[in-house]
Structures are given as C-alpha cells and as structure tokens.
Amino acid sequence: GFINDWQGCDFDPGILTCKSVKTGTCLTKAQVDALRDMFNGPRTSDGKSIYGPFNYDTGIGGSEWRGMHIGSSGTGKWDSADATLGLVNLSYLQLTPPDPDLDPLEFDFDRDAVRTRHTAANTDADSTFLSTFADHGKMIVYNGLSDQGMASGVLSAWYDEVVKVNGPAIRDSIRLFFIPGMCHCSGGKATDQFNMLDAITGWVENGKAPDRIIATGKAFPGVSRPLCPYPLVARYKDGDVNSADSFVCSK
C-alpha cells in the first residue's frame, strides 16, 4: 500500500513494545528507544534537531532502507551503509580537519557537529533566496518518502521556508513532489516510474505547470497514481482504486 498523507501519519513505535516476554512480533523497550532515536535524527543534548526527523513509510521494511540504517550483520559487527560509507564520508570529507581515526561512538553532537561547518557550504542545498531564479526559472524537486538518506521533513520544511521568504507566487516557479514508498531516487514499494523531464519541458516551453504527474512502478503492476505538488496529496475520489484517474490532489 501507500501512505499518501505522510505528514498526517503519527505512528508511534511504542505500540510495538512487548507486554511481557520478547517474541518475534514485538520489540523490547531498548529496541523501541533505538528506533525512535533513529527516526528523530541527530540532536544536541538539549534536544535541538541537527537533521531530521525521518518519517515512517512503507519502504522502511525493504532491503534498501535496512541496508542503509541497520544492516544485516548477525554477529553484532556494523555493516550498514551508515556505519561504513557514512563514517568514511564524515571522517574524510565532512570534518575539518579530516579525522581518519574518528570513533563514531565518541562523536559529541554538542561539541563536534560544528566541525562540519567549513564543508557545509559545498554540501548543504538549503538556500531559500530564490527570487532571482524565479524570474523566468522553473524547478521541480522530488524525493521518495522512503529515501534512506534524505529526510522528507527537512525538504518540506525547506520548501515551506522558500514560500515564506519569497511569497506564494514562488509556487509558479518551484514545485516539490513526494513519492510514497520510493527509496533514494528509485526503488522500494512504490510507483517510482514517472517522467519529470516531460513535466519540466512542458512547464518551461508551453507554460503548463505540473499540477499532477502520473506514476507507475514494477512493484505494483497495473497500478497508477498521481504525484501531487506539495503540500497537496493524492486522495481517493471514486472509481477503480488502481487508476490515477480515481484520485485527486488536495490537502
């Protein structure tokens, strides 16, 4: 299935806590706490968010998401991409100066996060000054709601700030689309096949703003869904549940 209204989903993993004996269908308190910490993202000791939170979506049960955040080690040895690729990236590319001997368990978000400030200008794409770009420019931004590396909430907050800073008319130049279930760029239990190139071409050359983009996917044969410009989401109207024509984009 799909979680279209992802911001309306307030799932609490605490509901999975074992009532008594640990079984394969419940989680211990320590596991629930770890899951909450993972989805909340890194924070300082006083609770200030550094990045995140991540949203709960259907794709988190897939191999892509698990491979990034949890891994598949049966011995306790770290083998997730966060613990391997992520550690190398942080140690050599993000920190100033580089720290090849970095122990991630000793990383202090109160003390050490500031060590990334020099590279942030090259890696952070969070500018909201887009009024000059909006003068005849067009941009489509899209993100999978099960993206194992990018937090959708951070992207939606950026877009909200873009609208606040530049005014509602900026939506005539920049639109954001979220794809339920899609992992990083593609994959996942999603309708992850769509043509953004045609959408941006039609917008630039013919003045046709992308009010909805039709998507399909190998994970759901015979199913199509509309991708809606944020903050709108696809809502069922009537008719065939497998057809995009049965859905409207609304808040």
Which residue ranges define each predicted feature?
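C-terminal His-loop and adjacent cap/lid subdomain of alpha/beta-hydrolase
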Residues: G1-K251
